[in-house]
Each structure stands twice: as C-alpha cells, then as structure tokens.
Amino acid sequence: MWSKRDEQKTYPPIRLNPFVFWSSAISISIFGMLFVLFPETSQHGLTWIQQQVNQLFGWYYMLVIILSLGFVAWLAFSQVGNIPLGKAQDKPEFGYLVWTSMLFSAGIGIALLYYGVAEPVDHFLRPPEGQGGTVEAAQNAMMYSFLHWGIHGWVLYALVGVTLGYFAFRRDLPLALRSALYPIFGERIHGLVGHMVDGFGILATIISLVTNLGIGALVMISGISYLFPDLPNTSSTLVVTVIMMMLVATLTTVIGIEKGLAWLSRINLRLLYLLLLFVFLTGPTNHLLNGLVQNTGDYLSHFVQKSFDLYLYDKNATGWLASWTIFYWAWWIAWAPFVGMFIARISKGRTIREVVLGVCLIPLGFTLAWISIFGNTAIDLILNHGQQIIGSLVIQDPALSLFKLLEYLPFHPYVAGIVVVICFVLFLTPVGSGTLMIANLSSQGGSSDSDSPIWLRVFWSIAITIVSIGLLLAGSFSAMQSAVVLCGLPFSVILLLYMFGLAKALKQETQQPVVESHTTETSGSD
C-alpha cells in the first residue's frame, strides 16, 4: 500500500512545515555563530574530525560511489529504464536544450572556473606518486582531474534525481528527500523520521551553498582586482560583492524555474561554450586535441583501478587521497540532495533512462573537455615554455590562476572581463536552484511540481547571505569547507537506503504495474 496521498483528488495549499523550518533555521544559526565567534577552534575541531573520517571511512566512501555507479547503470540499461517519472499522460515540462542546460548549470557551479586550471596544475606539481613537474606527472595529473570530475560524481545526482522524481511523480508522494524512504518506513516518513531527513538535507544544502558562495566571491574578487588593480581588496569590497551576487540570485529564485533559472541556464551554457572555444582556438589547438584524446584514454584505462585505489601500500600518498579523492566524493555526496531534488523537479515526464543518460553523459562531456583544454594549456605553458609562475600562483592563489592563464592568449583584458561575467552567472544557477529546493523542503502541501511561497525563498536567501558574510569576514571559510565534506558521511547512508527503496519499488512495479490515477492539482505557489 502506497501513500494515502494516492487517494486524494485535490492537494492542500502550500504552507510552512514548522518542525523542519525551525529546526533547520536554528541549527544553521548555531553553526554560523560558532564558526564566526570561534573561527580557529572551529577550524581545528572540524579538521581533526575530517581527518578521522578520512582515515576510518575512506574505504566506505569508495564503496558508496562504486555501488551508486553500478546501481545507476542498472537503472539505465535494464527494463526499468523505460518507466517514466510520472503518469502516462505526463509530458516533459522543458525541451531538451533547456533541460540539459539546467542539468549542467545546477550540477557544476562556479567550482569549474576555480578548479579548471588549478587542479590539473596542482596534481602536476604535487602528485601522489612519483616526481612532480615531469612528463609522467603531467599525464597522471589530467587522469586524476578526469577522475574527480568524471562520471563518479554525476551518478550521485542521477541516483537522487531519479529516486525523488519516481516517488514524487509516479507514486504521488511529496517532492522531498523523505519520500524515497517510503518503502522502508511507510507512513512514518510524514512524521519525525521524515522531518529529520528533510531537516538534515536543508542543513547540508545551506552549508554547500555557503561554500559555493565563498568560492564565487573569491573568484569574483580576484577577477575584479585583476581588472582594476587600484580597487581596494577590503572586507567592504567582499561584503558588497556577496550582497550583489545574492540579490540577483534571490531575484531568479523569486521569478521561478521557468522564467528565471531556465533563462539563466541557457545564457550560462552559451557563455561557457564561447570561452571554451576561445581558449581552444587561440591556444595550442593541435596539442589540445591530442590531449583530449589521450586524457580520455588514460581516464578509461585507469577507471576501475582508481575507483578502488586507496594507496594502501604507499602511506605517503594517503594524505593526497584524503585531500583530493575522498574530499571530492564527500563533496559530490553533500551536493546530491539539492542538485538531485532540482533534477527531479525539472524531469517530470521523462523516462528513468532519459534522466540517467542525460545527467551522466551530457554535462560530463563538456566538463571533461573543459578540464582537458584549460588544464593542458596551463601545463603546456609550464612544462614546455618555462612559465613556472602559473604553477606558483596555483599554489598561492588558485582563484587567480585562470586570469593569469588568459594573459598568454589574445585580448586577455577583455576576455578576463567576460570571465568575471561568466563567474557571476555561473554562481547564480546552483544557488538559485538550491535556495528554491531549501524553501520547498521547509514547506508542505501542494502538488509535487509546485514551489514554495516567495517569502520563504527570500528568507532562506537572506539567511544564506548573512551566514556567508559572517564566515568570510571571520576567516572561517575553510571551516565551512570541512563541514560540507562531513555532511557527506551521514547522507551517504541515506543514498544506500535510496537504492534499496527504489529497487524494492521498481521490483514491485515490474510485477504489478502502477495504477494510473488522475488528480486535480490545486496550485499553492507563486
């Protein structure tokens, strides 16, 4: 027996979920105050906890990623891939171009600009094995970067997106993190169990968004300081930048998905394509083509080995593993709640196979091309043209490394200005979608594809802004980075429950197909 919502002909109006809202608001306020008032103690404490988690649960993170990869492959290539996320009469709300643009924009964020140059160069100079700065180190650096930005992370988004979309649109449960646990807990998901899951999802999402806002602010400030050296790089500049970014992000959230986030995603993708094409054509084009082919081959040939590699027999490399691979797996897991929920929100009417392949392959291809082109351009300058200054800058100020790279290409002042604009737009989409999902999780009622009241979206946007400014001014940004990684551990358990619950529901459906129900939806949003 599925949720009693199946029997309802109309949906109740959207209203605040007091338990989820207040528990989340109070929790993030306490965390924020601790980080602001005691920045050094918070940093030391979280760093110690993170080290213990990495040491004790590194193997566990690896297994969760591998299990997720296998499960998502089964979703895509078995008969269950034909099952739609919705009823037979449901059609996709967004066309393929807009849909794929939103998939990409929500899942990537500004980190692609931050790490596109910095990560490959860092691996090249400080590899886990062997000597840095060599030809072998260059080849392995790109392979490691492909690993961290490759399909391992995207399957987590696909898993959460498909699972939430299935239970929301196929089983008529709320579009909330709790709903995927219905096969395990039954009607108890509408009580304390569900409130706790949604509340933790909000906390993890806010911490992730604050971290994203911090990265965005650092890149923006670096770009503005690069373009205008006389502009003072002070706390006031940082605060003004954060407020401006969040004002526009709030506006897109208020406008909604159709008019705000969808439009931004299209602009975002076009700007990124233009920048990628510019670097490809004005850089060492033939070298970059060779690099893309070879990097892809290296990634595929080491795929299985590196998916399981814990550097058991090389203790010197375990620190690198914790700082990079385990960090990335935990980061992807921590981002999965809100990105997956957003993917579910925009994927009603599409089949499971469509969503899995769309999420895992379309953004993946662009991401790997970006890492390859920017990374190989930077490494080529260091390895073959003696521009060690790029490497030094990556170690000292990674946010500035992209702007330094552009100096070796034509029209660099103008392109640097465009990068600042791209940075601003690229920041907006994940923050906008994340804020919308937080507001939806802290409300109840309405249909599965309706959104929360505008005032609730504005509230969470303001809360994220205040927490971000406080943390950045207190110098606690690195503490927040540690916190977002730690959020990955408890949510990884929820991912395992998601796989079990979805497999159970799909098995039941293949044996006894879902009876289509026609409901009259009463909109309570906007």
UniProtKB/Swiss-Prot annotation:
PROSITE patterns xrefs: BCCT
Claim: Cytoplasm is one of the keywords in the record: no
Cytoplasmic side stretches: 1-17, 78-93, 170-200, 258-272, 345-354, 439-457, 504-526
Subcellular location per the Swiss-Prot or TrEMBL entry: Cell inner membrane
Membrane-related topology note: Multi-pass membrane protein
Molecular function terms from GO: transmembrane transporter activity
Any Pfam family matching the protein: BCCT
Origin superkingdom: Bacteria
Entries under InterPro entries matching the protein: BCCT_CS, BCCT_transptr
Disulfide bonds: none
Knocked-out gene: effects: Mutant is impaired in osmo-independent choline uptake activity. The betT1/betT2 double mutant is completely impaired in choline transport.
Major location (coarse): membrane
Entry keyword set: Cell inner membrane, Cell membrane, Membrane, Transmembrane, Transmembrane helix, Transport
Stretch forming the signal peptide: none
Family per similarity comment: Belongs to the BCCT transporter (TC 2.A.15) family.
Protein name (Swiss-Prot/TrEMBL): Osmo-independent choline transporter BetT1
Gene coding for it: betT1
